[in-house]
Regions:
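Class I S-adenosyl-L-methionine
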Residues: 1-159, 165-172
């Protein structure tokens, strides 16, 4: 009735690979992280390569890295946000945000701005920013989200993410 059979997991995949090899193809596969190749996302993807031209399969070398390893640093997702449109402020709303949402935002400000060693500073906006997920916390009760100084994590199509900007001002 369309349900997976755990004890037969991978059979169709192996059949497919055997069929391709029977046609004369060589095969290799691996999981690659997009950020290692210059994309501003940490999404992992499985890649398969089949060849039958007599040449060996060659994989690209990473061009970027999270650490300082001589490669370029991972791209920051904050560099790809249109900062000319910060959306609608939460402060002029007719209906207040739910208490849980307010708590998530406060926790996120603490985690990604106040306690962050290098928070993301929005250029020319006098603001600090981060992305928040507002459909739950971690097991430790911490806010889900991320700094904008990193490549973006996977964002699904649910309406459960927000860009939080905390404006900074000088007090004399």
């Amino acid at each position: 009735k369309g349900y997976p059979i755990p004890e037969r997991k991978g059979e169709d995949y192996q059949k497919f690979i055997r069929s391709m090899k029977a046609l004369g193809y060589i095969f290799d596969c691996r999981e690659l992280v997009a950020a290692d190749y210059g994309a501003p996302t940490t999404r992992k993807r499985w890649y398969a390569v089949f060849r039958r031209d007599g040449k060996e399969i060659r994989w690209p070398e990473p061009t970027h890295s999270r650490e300082n390893t001589g490669l370029q640093r991972w791209k920051e997702c904050g560099d790809y946000i249109d900062w000319s449109d910060l959306g609608t402020s939460i402060f002029g709303r007719k209906k207040s945000l739910a208490e849980a949402t307010q708590k998530r935002i406060a926790n996120g400000i603490k985690k990604y701005i106040i306690d962050a060693p290098e928070p993301y500073i929005v250029k020319n906006k006098d603001a600090l920013a981060f992305i928040i997920q507002y459909h739950g916390e971690t097991r430790d009760g911490e806010s889900r989200g991320q700094l904008l100084t990193e490549p973006i994590k996977t964002i699904d199509t649910s309406n459960r993410y927000g860009l939080v900007t905390a404006f900074i001002t000088k007090y004399y």
